[in-house]
């Protein structure tokens, strides 16, 4: 391509970092952090009020929590408040299939869910632009 790149490993097994890679990282971090900030505001909470953040699925299993906080992906919280929880969708499905009590509880909680369309939220758009900077 002719794109400038930085070699991260040895020449035998080359892994390169490009400006495009950095840009994608900026966009990804900004989208996740901005989404978290909007949802917290709509819930009337500050990140400092969170007792726990559960990270689920493959994303939650393999992400380095400390690096994620340092890069700004997550709010600045003590690492012990962020828990890698594994396959919660599978666990939840098994719970409601095996327990009528769990099914009733899930149905009740489902009524409390509020859908937030972040792509159309003006505050999200503003935060997304602001959070693209690594200096936040």
Question: What does each model-found stretch correspond to?
Answer:
Residues 1-136:
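Helical "lid/coupling" subdomains associated with nucleotide-phosphate turnover
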């Amino acid at each position: 391509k002719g794109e400038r790149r930085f070699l991260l490993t040895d020449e035998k097994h080359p892994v390169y970092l490009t400006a495009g890679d950095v840009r994608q990282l900026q966009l990804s971090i900004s989208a996740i952090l901005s989404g978290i900030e909007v949802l917290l505001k709509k819930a009337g909470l500050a990140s400092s009020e969170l007792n726990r953040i559960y990270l689920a699925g493959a994303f939650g299993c393999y992400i380095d929590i400390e690096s994620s906080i340092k890069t700004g992906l997550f709010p600045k919280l003590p690492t012990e408040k962020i828990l890698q929880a594994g396959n919660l969708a599978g666990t939840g499905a098994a719970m409601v299939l095996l327990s009528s009590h769990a099914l009733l509880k899930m149905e009740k909680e489902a009524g409390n869910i509020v859908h937030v369309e972040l792509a159309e939220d003006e505050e999200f758009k503003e935060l997304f632009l602001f959070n693209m900077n690594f200096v936040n």
